[in-house]
Amino acid sequence: LVALIYTAFGLTCIYYFKDQPAVAAFLKGTIVENFGRWIAYSPDNNLPGLGWWVFIVTVFYFVIPAAIIKLLWRADLRDFGLRLRIEPGFWKLLAISSAIMLPLVYLMSLTEGFAAKYPFLQIYNGEPYIGGTLVAWELIYFVQFFGLEFFFRGFLVHSLKPSLGLYSIFVMTVPYCMIHFSKPMPETISAIAAGIFLGWLSYKNGSIWLGLILHCMVAFSMDIFALHAKG
């Protein structure tokens, strides 16, 4: 019950607090007004705003759920997907999943909706796109995926597992799909299958690491393919 209530609360907070212009308006007239203006209206690129988004999702995807696990439930984070071990057949499954996903991502990158959405990073000052800013963004982006995988495949799946069993995977998949609603439709539909698959891996092996590596790999390839498609 706590996990489900927190899911509604946490996703709501992310939706509103990630809005950089709203944050800038809220901070106007305070001693941190310049910070709000920087994250919302940086003249060089939108990396400050993306960094703010990653900070918000990390707080609500990882920091607060981890606090609930440790302080409220008095449980071990390793029982919620953070086991430091590699699952049996890890590399084989990673290779198979990559062979399936990368061609699909490439085909999606050829569509207008995909090209309009990715990459999230936008550069306004004429700096070459392939450079330090892109590297910084990808590293920040990967932090976001750690929080996301921990929240959905760790916190949600394993907190619901004792009462719902295998159905915890499908309950988790509903909000996971919904966070993709602003993205191209093929990606949102794919999130259903991905949510079930990655949820099953965590349910079976007690680890989020394969899902995290796959997510980071796909996200990086999406950005590169999108840049290639744009020329």
Stretch-by-stretch model annotation:
Residues 1-4, 47-50, 165:
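Membrane-interface helix-boundary signature
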Residues 1-37:
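N-terminal entry module detector
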Residues 1-12, 62-66, 93-105, 171, ...:
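Alpha-helical transmembrane segments
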Residues 14-18, 67-78, 201-204:
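Structural signal for the C-terminal ends of transmembrane alpha-helices
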Residues 22-55, 71-144, 231:
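Juxtamembrane helix-loop-helix connectors linking adjacent transmembrane helices
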Residues 55-76, 143-162:
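Transmembrane alpha-helical segments in integral membrane proteins
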Residues 100-231:
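Transmembrane helix-loop-helix hairpins at the membrane interface
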